[in-house]
Amino acid sequence: MKAKYKPTGKIYEIFNVRDDRNGYPQFLIRRDNEWVYISAKYFVTIEEEV
């Protein structure tokens, strides 16, 4: 799945989804050659055309 990061508009590939301790989703992305979990509230999903 791909999603757009709202603050920068950059598109990232989502590799995993997990919930934090409060139950909110976080996306695992690769940013600057590092794996980072970021809150899903900062992303807008992109519908892939088939």
Locate the predicted segments by residue.
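Basic/aromatic-rich interaction segments and small domains that mediate binding to polyanionic partners
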Residues: 1-42
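Short acidic DE-rich linear segments
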Residues: 47-50
